[in-house]
Amino acid sequence: MAIVGVGIDLVSIPDFAEQVDRPGTVFAETFTPGERRDAADKSSSAARHLAARWAAKEAVIKAWSSSRFSKRPALPEGIHRDIEVVTDMWGRPKVRLSGEIAKHLEDVTIHVSLTHEDQTAAAVAIIEEP
């Protein structure tokens, strides 16, 4: 397998928390019901966990963009909603794609790592192809 794209994103948790549930913001329709449910089940702030998931979505988009270097970006509408961060029974994150982006990335493996500490959430995404 060869790495074809790497993306990273940082999110200010306080800034994100102010906007996440505000109508009319990009965040209002960004998260799937499963992502919101998982964040609500955590012992700490739901906004902290959603901020890490937002960072993961952005990191995936950046990794995808970097894999298309010198090619026109082809980002479909509502792309963030089509990138879902799910976890296994041990809490390890994985990206599940749907919609148009799933068609563009059907033959790749996406690795993702999320973290949050104090006021910041971060994520890294690596895209590999066979």
Curated annotation (Swiss-Prot):
Species: Mycolicibacterium smegmatis (strain ATCC 700084 / mc(2)155) (Mycobacterium smegmatis)
Enzyme Commission no: 2.7.8.7
Catalytic activity: apo-[ACP] + CoA = holo-[ACP] + adenosine 3',5'-bisphosphate + H(+)
Gene Ontology, cellular component aspect: cytoplasm
GO annotation, biological process: fatty acid biosynthetic process
First-tier enzyme category under EC: transferase
Protein name: Holo-[acyl-carrier-protein] synthase
Keywords, alphabetical: Cytoplasm, Fatty acid biosynthesis, Fatty acid metabolism, Lipid biosynthesis, Lipid metabolism, Magnesium, Metal-binding, Transferase
Function per UniProt: Transfers the 4'-phosphopantetheine moiety from coenzyme A to a Ser of acyl-carrier-protein.
SUPFAM superfamilies: 4'-phosphopantetheinyl transferase
One Pfam short name: ACPS
Family listed: Belongs to the P-Pant transferase superfamily. AcpS family.
Cofactor(s) needed for function: Mg(2+)
Residues that bind Mg(2+): 9, 58
Entry keyword Magnesium: yes
